[in-house]
């Protein structure tokens, strides 16, 4: 975890950890939504960890490039860390770009023991075949600009649960760009856990 900004809640005797992976933009773990996911998971008496990808530390808007090499390497470092901490049940909660990065990671390092939840699925960017054994849940806004929930269900398949957030966009905001549906997402996450 050297060189990474991260938040880590370690619940004593927990073998479950939730890795929260932020979406695009220059702000990662400091965003209100990622912080709220972290706090919500911690309240379930499970361990939680969220971290910034290096491009956030450099205050850059976007990832390291189309192959996401830096992000894959960082995620590998984080997963290695949680294994050394003794966790045997890992679930990744990935927002948007985090879902894309996760799919690239699993294409390079397949691991059926890690579960994946995607918040805001981007069909043309995610390597669906790489995550078919990992993906358990997608929470998609009804008005997501990348894909409607019904479209995502066709791509992800019947083994994946899809939760539609009515009237929400890709960031779970209303038409005025107010994040009023984010709490609904948090409630669904708690119910899923």
List the model feature ranges, each with a label.
Residues 89-92, 116:
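Conserved alpha/beta-hydrolase fold motif
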Residues 168-182:
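Catalytic histidine-centered segment of alpha/beta-hydrolase-like enzymes
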Residues 1-85:
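Serine-hydrolase catalytic machinery in alpha/beta-hydrolase-like enzymes
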Residues 101-105, 127:
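Hydrolases whose catalytic domains are alpha/beta-hydrolase-1, hotdog thioesterase
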Residues 132, 137-140, 144:
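Short beta-strand/loop motif that positions the catalytic acidic residue
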Residues 111-123:
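A conserved short beta-strand
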Residues 93-102:
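Gly/Ala-rich beta-loop-alpha elbow adjacent to hydrolase catalytic centers
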Residues 142-147, 170-171:
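Acidic catalytic loop of the alpha/beta-hydrolase fold
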